[in-house]
Amino acid sequence: MFDQASYLIMRHLEFLNLLCEVSRLIIKYAAKQDVDRVSLESVNRDKIISILIGFHDQINQLFKNTPKENLKNLGLDEILKTWAQESEEKIEYVQALDIQILELLNQEKQKTKEDIQNVYLNRRKLGGYNLSNVK
């Protein structure tokens, strides 16, 4: 049980670190207005989150019916506390990155909206002129 718990916890923490890394990449690409890369990394991020949920569920299932005394005897109580603390810190960090991502995406959305509006207005201005018959 100890080995399985250690493995699951370490993998969970590795994927949390990967989630942070991918979130930083999304910020980098969003700042460069590289929409294709933002989309690609967002898909990767969603997959990582699904994997994290799976690991979290497995860890919870592993300790679901285990008395706290057994956890203490195995030395898992401190490991679980440390894991919970590290997970919480990473999640807070990812939430801060999410705010940055949303701000950058909203800026890009506003820019795109303005570009579309300008194209529309320019077409309306030129709409009175029939330029197809000009020699």
Where are these regions (language model features)?
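Short terminal interaction segments
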Residues: 75-135
